[in-house]
Amino acid sequence: MGSVSNQQFAGGCAKAAEEAPEEAPEDAARAADEPQLLHGAGICKWFNVRMGFGFLSMTARAGVALDPPVDVFVHQSKLHMEGFRSLKEGEAVEFTFKKSAKGLESIRVTGPGGVFCIGSERRPKGKSMQKRRSKGDRCYNCGGLDHHAKECKLPPQPKKCHFCQSISHMVASCPLKAQQGPSAQGKPTYFREEEEEIHSPTLLPEAQN
């Protein structure tokens, strides 16, 4: 009977092995596609604060020194820090990264020991701020260039044309603005008068003689 029991046991094991589910091809492909996280350390090679990305110079991988260093792409969204996220050139970092079709890409970037990154002192200059500065700030109450209307010390002034300073009409219906060419539009009358006086031949000594 012992031999019969052994045969039954062997047969049961074989049957169990046959019934064991095999790994689906989809699961195997998914496991192969999942990025393998690697650990590295190094410094920030460069970082563009306006674009929000740069490259790390990896000097060690999994505790093993690399010579020469290897570049690893970094995006601001991967930085472990508060507030505006950026990196300072030469800043020491630790990070996890993966291999992609484009190269090495960082997954999470911290300072040494997992602390917050220091970040760059630079801040991007917004286009809206540059446009606002180029046009200049003007007080809509008195026309002054050194303050805003809310800071004006004069009482409320009557509304007037910002082009010729006349109170009889607004800038949209200004006859002088309509007569001027595109190059003169946007310049108040007193600016144009000063330019005309500067370029007038009556002020030149040769013309007076």
Swiss-Prot record:
Modified residues (Phosphoserine): S3, S120, S200
Outcome, altering F73A: Does not affect localization to P-bodies
Effect ascribed to mutating F55A: Does not affect localization to P-bodies
Residue numbers of N-acetylglycine PTMs: G2
Location of the region described as Disordered in the Swiss-Prot/TrEMBL record: 1-31, 178-209
Localization (cell): Cytoplasm; Rough endoplasmic reticulum; Cytoplasm, P-body; Cytoplasm, Stress granule
Entry protein name: Protein lin-28 homolog A
Native source species: Homo sapiens
Gene name in the database record: LIN28A
